[in-house]
Amino acid sequence: MNKKVEGLTKETEAANYLSEQGYQILARNYRCRLGEIDIVARENGYLVFVEVKYRTNVEKGFPEEAITIQKQRRITNTAKYYLLVNRLPESTPCRFDVVVMLKEEIRLIKNAFDAYGS
C-alpha cells in the first residue's frame, strides 16, 4: 500500500475512533494555502482540530514526536483561517487534539498543544 493510501486509511480509522468517542466529524483533510488539518470535529462544545500521526514502529521516534513547533504553527494558522472562512467568531472555543496510532494501538491526546505552539 502506498503512503498516501495508507495515510487516508489511517485517517479514516481515526475518524471512526473519534466518532465512537462522541466527536461529530465536520471535515476531513481540510486544506487551504496555509496548510492542512486532518480532521475538524465538534466535541463537548469545542471545535476540535485533530492531527493524526501513524507509525508502524518507534525506530524514528513516537508518532506524536513528529508534531514539531513548526507543524503546530501551521495547524493553528490553518485553524484560524478555517474560523475566518466559515464565519465563526474568534471567540469560538477551540482545541487541538492528536490521534496517535502505533501499529494497532490508537491513543487520543486531548489539548495536545495550543494556538501559541506549546
Swiss-Prot record:
Classification via SUPFAM superfamilies: Restriction endonuclease-like
GO molecular function, one term: nucleic acid binding
CDD domains cross-referenced by the UniProt entry: PoNe_Nuclease
InterPro entries assigned: Restrct_endonuc-II-like, tRNA_endonuc-like_dom_sf, UPF0102_YraN-like
NCBIfam families hit by this protein: PRK12497.1-3, YraN family protein
Residues in the signal sequence: none
Top-rank taxon, per record: Bacteria
Family: Belongs to the UPF0102 family.
Gene3D superfamilies assigned to the protein according to its UniProt record, in alphabetical order: 3.40.1350.10
Protein name, as recorded: UPF0102 protein Cphy_2398
Originating species: Lachnoclostridium phytofermentans (strain ATCC 700394 / DSM 18823 / ISDg)
A Pfam entry, by short name: UPF0102
